[in-house]
Amino acid sequence: MSKEKVARFNKQHFVVGLKETLKALKKDQVTSLIIAEDVEVYLMTRVLSQINQKNIPVSFFKSKHALGKHVGINVNATIVALIK
């Protein structure tokens, strides 16, 4: 993904993309995650290991394309992190 965004999502802030999600996890800002169902598992290993330690809830979205469109970007989104 070429640009990461911070925007409003159902009155919550969120970040889009793997790099931004990892940054938010490192800062303990993540309240929950939305992961596209068609994402390659090896891309999510670092994220999944961190969220298991922090008990962060995870939801799944039907596809990367649909997730990107739902959050208002014109590219695929593998992951969206809702932040504090």
Curated annotation (Swiss-Prot):
Report whether Cell division shows up as a keyword of the record. no
Keyword list (alphabetical) reads: RNA-binding
Q: What terms describe the molecular function in GO for this protein? A: RNA binding
Domain of life per record: Bacteria
Keyword Lipid biosynthesis attached: no
Family annotation (Pfam families): Ribosomal_L7Ae
- Family of this protein: Belongs to the eukaryotic ribosomal protein eL8 family.
Query: Could you identify this protein by its name?
Result: RNA-binding protein SAOUHSC_00526
Query: Which source organism does the UniProt entry give?
Result: Staphylococcus aureus (strain NCTC 8325 / PS 47)
